[in-house]
């Protein structure tokens, strides 16, 4: 955070004093009188810069709605601005296919540099067929919704029996191969497959 000017520091201290003594913040006019600013637009300019620095929060619809933010408040605001809440949808297997459940169970915060569109969701993995790719039983895969995939992509795929599974995708002559990342398991060979999304990340709780 950049250093405050003496005027901005005076404004912060006056707001803090008024809230402490009176229980509510001062008006723009009162702030101007206290720090020697005759122009309300100049006061508004200082308040806007303080808000941009994360030191205050204002409600433009109310004349006295100026709130001083603590370090915790500023951290929370920055956190809220830098995350996107994505839906956690049902469960998907990394072993044998299971029916895909599309009901949203909850929403989970992810960094906005991962969630670059509104087509991202999470699924909980059940099974061990992707362990060699670092996807373990109980993990959550982060999935970008798309209906095409390149050979070698890890995807969530819907089989011919309308069941969803996480596998590595390969399009081969006359069929599709959904390849597990576990040497003890056989691939799933299908004539038709529907891609539900590409796995772009994994979230794991360490117990």
From Swiss-Prot:
The record marks 94-95 as: Cleavage. Disulfide bonds: none annotated. Transmembrane segments: none annotated. GO terms for biological process: DNA repair; DNA replication; negative regulation of DNA-templated transcription; proteolysis; SOS response. Residues 28-48 bind DNA. It catalyses: Hydrolysis of Ala-|-Gly bond in repressor LexA. Belongs to the peptidase S24 family. Represses a number of genes involved in the response to DNA damage (SOS response), including recA and lexA. In the presence of single-stranded DNA, RecA interacts with LexA causing an autocatalytic cleavage which disrupts the DNA-binding part of LexA, leading to derepression of the SOS regulon and eventually DNA repair. Homodimer. This is LexA repressor. It comes from Brevibacillus brevis (strain 47 / JCM 6285 / NBRC 100599).
């Amino acid at each position: 955070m950049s250093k405050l000017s003496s005027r901005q520091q005076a404004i912060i201290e006056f707001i803090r004093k008024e809230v402490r003594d009176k229980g509510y913040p001062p008006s723009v006019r009162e702030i101007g009188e206290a720090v020697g600013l005759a122009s309300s637009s100049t006061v508004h300019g200082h308040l806007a810069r303080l808000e941009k620095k994360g030191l205050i929060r204002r409600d433009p619809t109310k004349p006295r709605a100026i709130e001083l933010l603590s370090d915790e408040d500023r951290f929370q605001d920055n956190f809220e601005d830098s995350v996107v809440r994505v839906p956690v949808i049902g469960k998907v297997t990394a072993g044998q296919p299971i029916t895909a459940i599309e009901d949203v169970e909850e929403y989970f915060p992810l960094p906005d540099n991962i969630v670059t569109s509104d087509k991202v969701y999470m699924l909980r993995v059940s099974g061990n067929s992707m362990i060699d790719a670092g996807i373990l039983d109980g993990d959550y895969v982060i999935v970008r919704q798309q209906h095409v995939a390149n050979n070698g992509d890890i995807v969530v795929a819907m089989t011919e029996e309308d069941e969803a599974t996480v596998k590595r995708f390969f399009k081969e002559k006359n069929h599709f191969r959904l390849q597990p990342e576990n040497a003890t398991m056989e691939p799933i060979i299908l004539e038709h497959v529907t891609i539900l999304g590409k796995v772009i990340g994994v979230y794991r709780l360490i117990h």
